[in-house]
Amino acid sequence: MTPLHPARSTLHRRSVLAALLSVAAGVARAGDDGEPAGPLRIVVAYPPGGVSDAIARALAAELAPRLGVPVQVENRPGAGGAIALRSLARAKADGRLLVFSAVTPLALDPQLRVGPAAEGIRGGPPPAVAPVAGVMLTPSLLVGTPAFRGRSVADLLAIARERPGGLRWATSGIATTGHLVLEQIRVAGGIVVTHIPYKGGGQQLSDALAGQFELLSTNVGALQLRYVRSGRFKALAVGAPQRVPQLPDVPTLAELGFPQANLASRFGLFAPAGTPPARLRRLNGAVDAALQQPAIRGALLEAGSLPMGGSAEAFADEIARSNAEIARAWPSASRMPVN
């Protein structure tokens, strides 16, 4: 190895020392202003390969420079998002761990709720979590796979009545919005179907394309839209306040006579309860700013979702609205079994 020139060696030592002092100063500043040192972790409550995972990773890339720390993303799927959310109860409330999830488990998972079921489900966020920011509102989508020989919800009902239990209906898991949609149509339509709960993500779509079941309750997303446009999926209905622009010919479930099943999914970021208010405000501001960026907004709109944003208080209000919708759709939802 060629030895360093003395002058270069001195410069090298000074550069290393300056870098170390800079890091130390950064850590000191983090402690002085109440900001935790170290990377931020975002746990996505769903498997890799889905819309939620893609949006969470795009958001992480925008948050890192705004917060001045690395942002790491990992996946912890299961129980429709409840497993990741439950982990917040065991986490240190320093604002270094966030969970990206739909809000549905906050109403449906008994481990996240406290108090009387009716009171809890109609209220806002449960005490186990602190809302940070709303990220997106995603319409639900009911599709027929290549194995489905009908072309409409009317056909679905007719086939199910002809062959009780013969239609296999997949969702992203028990106690998800898709499961609620299934149950509402099942009860209102007086039919029997076979529920196949997944953990969400790419495997569910792969099996759908392979025709391993006839029906899929999912969310509007870029891949789903691609498969509908190519004819591989038959779009039967959407759950949204009005028809979605990407699928203007597909009716809402309310139009088809299933208003209680006309549900969309709200997704956002959550921190452990007890996270310092100043840290929550900092995180909320960074998320809200990131959602204004063209890259993020474009990715959301391409996926068929609407950006949310706004304050943590506004997100808490959205959670309360979602809980009220679920309470109306399924009065016994808080007693619903969760994986």
Segments predicted by a language model, with ranges:
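Beta->alpha turn/N-cap motifs
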Residues: 99-105, 171, 201, 217-224, ...
